[in-house]
């Protein structure tokens, strides 16, 4: 999907509510620094100082919209950044620009970092000829999930289920609580109805067979070593060709290619949201006729 179109997924009311909550967190009371800057009309340039994928424009916009500032973008969402590059310009009262600066930079840097990691993962997987789905997980930051899931999609990865209502996933603890694999899947199928898929986490071929026989749509082969994963998936698919197989657990950018295979439909990586490094951006105020260029990071 075109990254530019992904912003249509984000409800304006949700964007405004998130932006307001982030600003409230950073400045719940008096902003003493505003007495230093004053409220004169000002402008600032957003610079990208590290390579990666630009993601998070809607959140950046929402933050400054709350502060009556205007953002003009020079690069579209999903652009590949080559530092140092001028990404956007923000205009508004000086004290409002600086009130939104850190919150907006944090959000953009984090979202872009996740998009960059996702794009790398997809590129690595595609280099093997594998055509399945690279996906994130539900291992996200509380209160920041929308940003992180959106970043995955800008980077070309699937966001997996957005929340508990997106799919019924039966994990080991659910099986223990239900009393058996079969009972857990039966209850999941009853809850899912016709509109939701049921996925079951399995740690052995025997569990995978039981899950598929009980009616699972997807079987997650969790924490399998690559040399065990592929024969297990092949055996499962031979018996249950309509069941999709997800590989998860221990997957990184370094070993991702080892998990790509004919019988694997989805590979999920928690590190895309848990370990992706943030990109480096800066927002610099400037006077008319004077646009400072920050130094790029050294790699």
UniProtKB/Swiss-Prot annotation:
Sequence segments annotated as region (Important for hexamer formation): 8-12
E.C. code: 2.4.2.19
Residues bearing PTM Phosphothreonine: 291
GO MF: identical protein binding; nicotinate-nucleotide diphosphorylase (carboxylating) activity
UniProt source species: Mus musculus (Mouse)
Protein name, entry field: Nicotinate-nucleotide pyrophosphorylase [carboxylating]
Keyword Secreted: no
Reactions performed catalytically: nicotinate beta-D-ribonucleotide + CO2 + diphosphate = quinolinate + 5-phospho-alpha-D-ribose 1-diphosphate + 2 H(+)
Underlying gene: Qprt
UniProt-annotated binding residues for quinolinate: 102, 138-139, 160-161, 171, 201, 222, 248-250, 270
One of the protein's GO biological processes: 'de novo' NAD biosynthetic process from L-tryptophan
Pathway as given in its UniProt record: Cofactor biosynthesis; NAD(+) biosynthesis; nicotinate D-ribonucleotide from quinolinate: step 1/1
GO CC aspect terms: catalytic complex; cytosol
Domain of life: Eukaryota
Subunit description: Hexamer formed by 3 homodimers.
Family (UniProt): Belongs to the NadC/ModD family.
Pfam assignment, any one: QRPTase_C
Its job: Involved in the catabolism of quinolinic acid (QA).
């Amino acid at each position: 999907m075109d990254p530019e179109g992904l912003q249509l997924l984000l409800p304006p009311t949700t964007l405004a509510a998130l932006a307001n909550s982030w600003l409230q967190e950073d400045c719940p009371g008096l902003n003493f620094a505003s007495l230093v800057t004053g409220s004169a009309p000002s402008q600032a340039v957003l610079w990208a100082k590290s390579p990666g994928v630009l993601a998070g424009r809607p959140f950046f916009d929402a933050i400054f919209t709350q502060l009556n500032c205007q953002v003009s973008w020079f690069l579209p969402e999903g652009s590949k950044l080559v530092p140092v590059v001028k990404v956007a310009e923000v205009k508004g009262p000086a004290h409002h620009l600086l009130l939104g600066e850190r919150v907006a930079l944090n959000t953009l840097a984090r979202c872009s970092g996740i998009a960059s990691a996702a794009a790398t993962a997809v590129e690595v997987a595609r280099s093997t000829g594998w055509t399945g789905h690279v996906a994130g997980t539900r291992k996200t930051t509380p209160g920041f999930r929308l940003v992180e899931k959106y970043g995955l999609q800008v980077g070309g990865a699937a966001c997996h289920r957005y929340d508990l209502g997106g799919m019924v996933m039966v994990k080991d603890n659910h099986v223990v609580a239900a009393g058996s694999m079969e009972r857990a899947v039966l209850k999941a199928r009853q809850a899912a109805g016709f509109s939701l898929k049921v996925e079951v986490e399995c740690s052995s071929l025997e569990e995978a067979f039981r899950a598929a026989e009980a009616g699972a749509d997807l079987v997650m082969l969790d924490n399998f070593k690559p040399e065990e994963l592929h024969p297990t998936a092949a055996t499962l698919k031979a018996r249950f060709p309509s069941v999709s197989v997800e590989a998860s657990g221990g997957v990184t950018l370094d070993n991702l290619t080892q998990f790509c295979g004919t019988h694997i439909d989805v590979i999920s990586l928690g590190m895309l949201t848990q370990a992706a490094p943030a990109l480096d951006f800066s927002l610099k105020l400037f006077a008319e006729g004077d646009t400072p260029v920050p130094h790029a990071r050294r790699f």
